[in-house]
Amino acid sequence: MARKNSLHPFVQSLLTAAAASYIRLLNRTLRWDVRGEEHHEKLITSGKAFIYAFWHSRLLMMPRLQKHHNLPISVLISEHGDGELLARTMDHFNIIARRGSAQNPRKKQKQKGGASALKALVKDAKNGIVIGLTPDGPRGPRQRAQAGVAQLARLAGVPVLPTTYNVKVGKRLKSWDRLILPLPLPFSKAVFIYGEPIYVKDDIEKGRQDIEASLNHITEKADLMVGQDYSPPAPLMAQGDIS
């Protein structure tokens, strides 16, 4: 069962409004260097849905994606208590929040809502809504893609666009995902990178591997471009069915 957030609704409103203001401030004050925009632009101009895939550590600037087009975005957010705060923050950017898990629906899970969330996202994509997912969410292993993202791409028949960012001035938290917390220093360097779109055919495992490899490649590139140390993925021995 999902853990409920114990914060008073008024406190939640204050926190999420502050978080949304912080994200907008970052968008306005940082000096963004965007790479791979041609991949993004090609998918946008097609007018069809696709999937933004970004590691959990880089989800903070996800609302920045919507400012570049008028397409609606639907994101998958954990049913855990902290997911409620994130979902309410996304409301400030008119981003649709689907609650659940992107884990492989063919595996047993303790989390409820995963299968229904997957069905909702497939329906969204087929209706032309762009999807946003963290392949290693909600609880890792860090930078190891779960099969659910590739499964969604195949079922919906849409490509996956690997996406990442980093900033020159910020803090990397000691959380499981090593979350990047940018500081809004005016004109500080920030980099946003889009990888090449990935089309998942019948081989879900190959699709999963391709998504993971591409995300780690562009994430390392983004880290190095802003002079930060690359935070590698969790060891393979730590990978498994997280529940």
Give the role of each language-model region.
Residues 1-66, 72, 88, 95-96, ...:
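Membrane-anchoring hydrophobic helices of lipid-metabolizing enzymes
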Residues 5, 143-204:
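A cross-family acyltransferase "interaction/gating" segment
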Residues 33, 55, 111-115, 142:
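A conditional alpha-helix N-cap/helix-loop micro-motif detector
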Residues 51-53, 76, 132-134:
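Structural motif
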Residues 78-127:
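Conserved nucleotide-cofactor-binding alpha/beta core module
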Residues 118-152, 156:
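Catalytic-site beta-strand/loop segments enriched in glycine and acidic/polar residues
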